[in-house]
């Protein structure tokens, strides 16, 4: 089962990183299968693979990982559904992804509610200089779009291969 500190951290900070969530051998399997489906997105300088659930059993296994289910159910409740399932690869030289929260956040009168959540699997190391995901801890509680200076308060989500990062959809996040 998922260590309780991750449930507490996602409530307090809006995100958590679970290290050693899967093996390096499994990361290799995921990478190999994912690269078969990657397509270049020349407009943003990234590679993407969409609709992964239908692309092979390994992607079904990933969606049903016990840590993934535990945190998504904590945030969204037992009747959640999988809306988007993509893989992406952003070279360090690619443009940043501006700070944002995920629709439908913010939604007036819904303070504290979570309508979506995200999980990122580190099939490679996410280092300080690799253009990692950025988050502003605690902003999932604000129920508003990011401030103009949000990036100045952001922290890098640095994690070793085999980790899973997850966050509340209202959390301000982007990419370096």
Per-range role (PLM):
Residues 23-25, 87-90, 126-128, 140-141, ...:
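Short, solvent-exposed loop/turn segments at secondary-structure junctions
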Residues 17-18, 121, 165-167:
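Short hydrophobic-aromatic micro-motifs
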Residues 176:
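Ligand-binding loop in jelly-roll beta-barrel domains
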Residues 158-173:
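Conserved metal-binding segment of the jelly-roll/cupin
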């Amino acid at each position: 089962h998922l260590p309780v500190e991750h449930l507490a951290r996602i409530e307090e900070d809006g995100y958590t990183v679970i290290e050693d969530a899967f093996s390096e051998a499994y990361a290799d399997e995921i990478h190999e299968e994912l690269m078969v489906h990657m397509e270049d997105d020349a407009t943003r300088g990234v590679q993407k693979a969409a609709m992964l659930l239908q692309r092979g059993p390994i992607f079904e296994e990933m969606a049903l990982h016990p840590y993934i289910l535990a945190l998504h159910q904590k945030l969204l409740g037992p009747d959640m559904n999988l809306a988007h399932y993509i893989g992406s690869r952003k070279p360090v030289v690619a443009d940043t992804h501006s700070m944002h929260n995920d629709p439908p956040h913010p939604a007036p009168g819904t303070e504290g509610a979570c309508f979506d959540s995200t999980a990122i699997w580190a099939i490679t190391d996410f280092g300080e200089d690799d253009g990692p995901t950025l988050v502003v801890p605690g902003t999932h509680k604000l129920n508003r779009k990011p401030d103009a200076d949000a990036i100045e308060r952001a922290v890098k989500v640095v994690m070793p291969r085999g980790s899973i990062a997850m966050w509340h959809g209202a959390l301000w996040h982007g990419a370096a």
